[in-house]
Amino acid sequence: MGYYVNPSAESFAVIARSKSGFYQYCKSNIKQKKIQEVSIKTAFTFLAEGKHIVSFVGAGGKSSLIDAIAKWSSSQGKKVLVTTTTHIFRPQDEFLAMNEKQLQEIWAAGHWAVIGATEEKDQQKLKMPELDWMRQAMELSDLVLIEADGSKRLPCKVPADHEPVLLPESDIVVAVLGLSALGRSLKECCFRLEKAKKLLSADENHLLTEKDMASIL
């Protein structure tokens, strides 16, 4: 999967993840087409900073990335909160907090806490929690990780006009694409197909290139 972090004219990083670890292209070496293996702390420098509310948007890989960051940050003693403004899969009940007492108990056990409201149509999923409870939990946290987009489990997505669903409190956005989309046709791997065709000026049989994926990110 690939990530585009802190996009700006002055500072950006493109991160790739495989089973063996994280790899980074940065502004200083991207022209040489070199990558370097980095730790999760180096790949996502905001983890070494103060409190952040981070929204994850885009396509395949958001949940696994959130889990990796939550696991590492919890191991560093941080009170990590995972939630959603769209939908996420329901965690084990012992990690789901419905009130402040449960939240503190989960953190005291060294795990990250998850909050959300049960989705009526699918009991295995959570939707965005009640906003007052969400903001209370965020206030108590050291790091907040929000899944703020959906892609029907496809590796590629071009957002609709109403997407992603970002809270005003969120100060960092991480865009995600699954590298498994590379070399595959738009119709096979891209959510919001018509949006993707328009963005790339391509038909549904077009095979995604590195340049296409950069354009989408």
Residue ranges and their predicted role:
Residues F56, V80-T84, I115-A117, V144-A148, ...:
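General beta-strand structural signal in soluble alpha/beta enzymes
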Residues V5, A9-A16:
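Acidic, Ala/Val/Gly-enriched low-complexity intrinsically disordered segments
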Residues K34-K41:
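N-terminal pre-Walker A segment at the start of P-loop NTPase domains
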Residues Q123-M134, D149-L217:
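Conserved catalytic-core segment of NTP-binding enzymes
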Residues T42-S73:
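Walker A (P-loop) phosphate-binding motif
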Residues K71-Q124:
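N-terminal phosphate/diphosphate-binding loop that engages ATP/GTP or pyrophosphate donors
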